[in-house]
Regions:
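Aromatic sugar-binding surface patches on proteins
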Residues: 59-70, 180-191, 301-312
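Short beta-strand elements
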Residues: 93-110, 214-231, 335-361
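Short glycine/proline/serine/threonine-rich loop/turn segments at secondary-structure transition edges
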Residues: 73-83, 194-204, 315-325
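C-terminal low-complexity, Ser/Thr- and acidic/Pro-rich disordered "stalk" regions positioned immediately N-terminal
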Residues: 355-383
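C-terminal membrane-anchoring or membrane-association module
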Residues: 397-416
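Short, solvent-exposed loop/edge segments of extracellular or virion-exposed proteins
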Residues: 1-3, 113-124, 234-245, 375-378
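Juxtamembrane/start-of-transmembrane alpha-helix segments at the extracytoplasmic/lumenal side
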Residues: 380-394
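Short, solvent-exposed loop/linker segments at the N-terminal edge
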Residues: 3-11, 123-132, 245-253
Length: 416
C-alpha cells in the first residue's frame, strides 16, 4: 500500500524490486528515478533529478533486491513520489516498472502549515493573563483519508528558540483526527497562564504523527502565521514645557507621557488611556472630585513604536506632590468594543513620575548700572565733612605760612 515519510532534510527511500526470468550468474544493473506524480515528470531537487543505480549478480532467475535513494525532501513536502525502475543486462533494457498509479511504487510526503490566533480577539495579539488560549489551525495535504492521525503542538519562545516553560513545564496540546479527504484542516487549542509573557512572541510548532511516526511538521521559529505577539508598553512622563520631570505648580500644567509599545498588530486600532496617581497615597489624583485622565487613539504602522498622551490640569494646589502616570492599552474591535491587552502601572517607577514644586518668589529686577557721579555733601554725612574740613585746615595753614613769610621779608627790607 501507500508509504508515508516525513519530508526531512535527509530521507532514505528503499525500493524493493522483485525480478523473475533473469539470467542467473550474470551481472545486471537496476536504474531507478523518482517521479512527481502530479506532473508526471522526474522530480528535481535543487535542479537535479533523484536517481539511484545498483549492479548485482543474481544467483537464481528470480528474487528481490533493494535500491536505495537518499535525498533532501524538504522541497518535496506535500508531493507524491513514484519510483520508476529499469533493469539492464549490459546496455540492453530487459525489464521496467514505470506506473504512476502503482501504490506499491508510491511514497507520500505529507505537509502541514499552521496559522495561530487568539480566539478572543480573532488575531495574533496575545493577552498576558492567567487564563490565556491560542488556537492553531493546521492545514494538511497528502494524508490518507480514513486513517487516524495525531496532531501535537508545542509553544516556543521566539527570543530563545527554546520551548516556552510555564512553571518549568512546556506548553503542549494534542488531538486525534481522521481526515475524510487527503487534504484539509484541523484545530489544536493551547490553554495556559500567560501573566508573565508581556513583550514575548510565541511560535507554535506542530507535527502530525501516523502510528507514532512523524509524517509532517511545521517548525519555523521565524514564521509570522505561526506567531502570537504579546504586547508590552513602557512610559516616560515629563514636563510638557521643558521636557524634564520637575514641574512648577501653576494653574496650567501640562504633562506629556511618551508611551513606547512592542508587539502590536500593524493597521489595527488601539486606544491608550492614562490616569494621574498621587504617589503618596497610591490613589488616583482627584481635582474637584474627579480623576485626571487623558487618552490617545492610534493605528500603528509597525509592531514597535511610540505615541504620546498629554494631560492638562490646574496644578496650583499640588506643590510638593509627586504624580505617577498609569497607562492602559486597549485593542479596539471593528464594532468599537474596547479590550484591555496590557498596562503599565508602577507607583514607584521613576520614569512615570513627575514632581510639582512651588513657584520661586519673585526677585526684584536689579537697577541698570550708570556711571558714578559724586553726590553733594549732605547733612549727617560725617566722612565727607571731615574730609573737607581737613582740606580747609591745610589750606589755612598754608595761607598762614605764606603770610608770615611775606611779612618777615617785608620787615627785613624796611630795616635795610
Amino acid at each position: 500500500g501507500l508509504q508515508m515519510a516525513h519530508a526531512d532534510e535527509e530521507v532514505t527511500l528503499i525500493d524493493t524490486v522483485s525480478y523473475s526470468n533473469v539470467p542467473a550468474g550474470e551481472e545486471l544493473t537496476l536504474q531507478g528515478i523518482l517521479m512527481d506524480k502530479e506532473t508526471g515528470e522526474a522530480l528535481e531537487i535543487d535542479g537535479e533529478t533523484v536517481t539511484s543505480e545498483l549492479t548485482f549478480t543474481p544467483e537464481s532467475t528470480e528474487g528481490t533486491v533493494d535500491v536505495e535513494f537518499t535525498f533532501n525532501a524538504t522541497e518535496a513536502a506535500g508531493k507524491t513520489l513514484v519510483v520508476f525502475e529499469s533493469l539492464y543486462y549490459g546496455e540492453e533494457e530487459i525489464a521496467s516498472h514505470q506506473d504512476l498509479s502503482s501504490p506499491e511504487q508510491t511514497l507520500v510526503l505529507p505537509s502541514v502549515s499552521t496559522t495561530a490566533a487568539n480566539p478572543e480577539l480573532g488575531n495574533q495579539t496575545g493577552l498576558a493573563k492567567a487564563e490565556a488560549s491560542i488556537t492553531d489551525v493546521a492545514e494538511y495535504t497528502n494524508l490518507i483519508a480514513g486513517e487516524t492521525f495525531t496532531i501535537r503542538g508545542t509553544l516556543m519562545d521566539q527570543e530563545t528558540g527554546e520551548e516556552l516553560l510555564i512553571d518549568e513545564k512546556p506548553v503542549t496540546a494534542e488531538a486525534e483526527f481522521t481526515p475524510e479527504e487527503t487534504s484539509g484542516t484541523t484545530e489544536l487549542t493551547f490553554a495556559f497562564n500567560a501573566e508573565a509573557l508581556a513583550g514575548k512572541t510565541l511560535v507554535v510548532f506542530e507535527e502530525i504523527l501516523y502510528k507514532d511516526q512523524v509524517v509532517a511538521s511545521h517548525r519555523d521559529i521565524s514564521s509570522d502565521p505561526q506567531s502570537i505577539y504579546f504586547p508590552q508598553i513602557g512610559t516616560s512622563a515629563t514636563d510638557g514645557e521643558d521636557g524634564d520631570q520637575e514641574i512648577l505648580a501653576d494653574s496650567e500644567v501640562t504633562i506629556k507621557d511618551t508611551v513606547s509599545y512592542e508587539n502590536l498588530v500593524p493597521g489595527a486600532s488601539y486606544l491608550l488611556k492614562g490616569v494621574l496617581m498621587d504617589q503618596e497615597t497610591g490613589e488616583e489624583l482627584l481635582l474637584d472630585g474627579n480623576p485626571v485622565t487623558a487618552e490617545t487613539a492610534f493605528t500603528p504602522e509597525e509592531r514597535n513604536g511610540s505615541v504620546e498622551v498629554v494631560f492638562t490640569l490646574d496644578g496650583s494646589s499640588l506643590a510638593g506632590k509627586s504624580l505617577v502616570v498609569f497607562e492602559t492599552l486597549y485593542y479596539v474591535d471593528a464594532d468599537g468594543t474596547q479590550r484591555e491587552i496590557c498596562s503599565h502601572k508602577d507607583i514607584d517607577d521613576a520614569g512615570q513620575t513627575v514632581h510639582l514644586s512651588e513657584n520661586p518668589p519673585e526677585v526684584p529686577e536689579e537697577p541698570t548700572e550708570t556711571p558714578s557721579v559724586s553726590n553733594p555733601v549732605k547733612t549727617g554725612d560725617d566722612a565727607p565733612i571731615l574730609l573737607y574740613l581737613g582740606i580747609g585746615a591745610g589750606a589755612l595753614v598754608l595761607a598762614g605760612a605764606l603770610t608770615v613769610l611775606y611779612l618777615r621779608r617785608r620787615k627785613q627790607k624796611e630795616n635795610k
